[in-house]
């Protein structure tokens, strides 16, 4: 039977990513696998905002640090024995499949999909699509056309995210 030993889950603070994270926790527990929770701050966005907001980098890093800390706590409390977190700066489309997958020796990458429409995907592409195309290992994209009505995020709550929004 095929088992996964090192699962990488990409999170970005969206409810879709948290839904995928919950599934990654289940897969990690079933396989007794290491779970690496990653967040990549898109440096292209960062460079365009730097001129307008000198604190953007610090806010982004604090958001990501707290997000990853929350996910690590949830996974550990759910029974995942080996949970690591990684924060990177750069293009998520390149860093996740080409750098992080190798760095953590992932044999499965999991991610959510944000539900971009066809025009948006054509213009900006999707991170999940890039991961599928460039990954050296299996990829599971958790599709969610619409989150279940009873879904309540534990980490990426609206209240959590509002702490980091510009006022």
Swiss-Prot record:
Subcellular location: Cytoplasm
The UniProt record lists the keyword Cytoplasm: yes
Domain of life where this protein originates: Bacteria
Alphabetical list of InterPro entries matching this protein: Rossmann-like_a/b/a_fold, Universal_stress_UspA, UspA
Main subcellular localisation: cytoplasm
GO CC terms in record: cytoplasm
Chain coiled-coil ranges: none
SUPFAM superfamilies given in the database record: Adenine nucleotide alpha hydrolases-like
This protein's record includes keyword Cell cycle: no
Keywords, comma-separated and alphabetical: Cytoplasm
Pfam families (alphabetical): Usp (PF00582)
Similarity annotation: Belongs to the universal stress protein A family.
Protein name: Putative universal stress protein SSP1056
């Amino acid at each position: 039977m095929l088992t996964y030993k090192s699962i990488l889950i990409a999170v970005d603070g969206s409810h879709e990513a948290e839904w995928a994270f919950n599934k990654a926790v289940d897969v990690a527990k079933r396989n007794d696998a290491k779970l690496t929770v990653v967040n990549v701050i898109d440096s292209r966005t960062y460079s365009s905002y730097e001129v307008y907001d000198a604190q953007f980098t610090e806010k982004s890093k604090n958001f990501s640090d707290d997000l990853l800390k929350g996910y690590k706590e949830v996974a550990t409390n759910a029974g995942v024995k080996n949970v690591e977190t990684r924060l990177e700066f750069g293009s998520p489309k390149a860093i996740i499949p080409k750098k992080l997958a190798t760095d953590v020796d992932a044999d499965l990458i999991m991610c959510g999909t944000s539900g971009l429409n066809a025009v948006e995907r054509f213009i900006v592409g999707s991170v999940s699509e890039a991961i599928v195309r460039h990954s050296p290992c299996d990829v599971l994209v958790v599709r969610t056309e619409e989150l279940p009505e009873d879904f309540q995020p534990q980490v990426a709550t609206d209240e959590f995210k509002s702490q980091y929004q510009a006022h």
